[in-house]
């Protein structure tokens, strides 16, 4: 769905065009931006700049604060991990937003993800599942982040552990994630995450330094 913003001169701009000018601070556009946030949740799309603009408008206009939109923005920013979108969004929160119980729950979930305690995350996610039920693709976005961490941490991993880290998924779904990430089943309940040839190898670098380049420096040391 295309979102157009109506200007005072009667003309319309796209949200991206509006965000590139002073109109991004016009509270008259907040409802359109909030609708855009809801569409992102529904359609599994993401626009960080627009979402941060909403939080900034809340700062300037606290009486227009919408907590449901705040939750959606924060949860959508979690789907972009390992990027720092959540930190940027959190920095724009008002004191009343920070005191909100649901906001604190989302912040706790973010902390758990950042320290890679994925088993605990899925437990907390199950308890709070209604909070992000409306966000399409939320679980798979988190699994993509989990896969990123696994890929940078393990060479091989037990299949049962991988299944647990990905949220206790079905065996068929696990096989799909293994294939998606280019991993290999080794047998005996193990998954090869990184081949030996993919490991970082040391390399000796020889740099030729001409005497003229250091002559002046050596002269100063005499």
Curated annotation (Swiss-Prot):
It is found in: Cytoplasm. Component of the eukaryotic translation initiation factor 3 (eIF-3) complex, which is involved in protein synthesis of a specialized repertoire of mRNAs and, together with other initiation factors, stimulates binding of mRNA and methionyl-tRNAi to the 40S ribosome. The eIF-3 complex specifically targets and initiates translation of a subset of mRNAs involved in cell proliferation. One of its GO terms (biological process) is regulation of translational initiation. GO terms for molecular function: ribosome binding; RNA binding; translation initiation factor activity. InterPro entries: ARM-type_fold (IPR016024), CSN8_PSD8_EIF3K (IPR033464), eIF3k (IPR009374), PCI_dom (IPR000717), Transl_init_fac_sub12_N_euk (IPR016020), WH-like_DNA-bd_sf (IPR036388), WH_DNA-bd_sf (IPR036390). Gene3D superfamilies: ARM repeat, domain 1, Winged helix-like DNA-binding domain superfamily/Winged helix DNA-binding domain. Residues 46-208 form the PCI domain. This is Eukaryotic translation initiation factor 3 subunit K. The keyword Protein biosynthesis applies. Keywords: Cytoplasm, Initiation factor, Protein biosynthesis. Component of the eukaryotic translation initiation factor 3 (eIF-3) complex. The eIF-3 complex interacts with pix. The keyword Cytoplasm applies. Belongs to the eIF-3 subunit K family. Disulfide bonds: none annotated. One of its GO terms (cellular component) is eukaryotic 48S preinitiation complex.
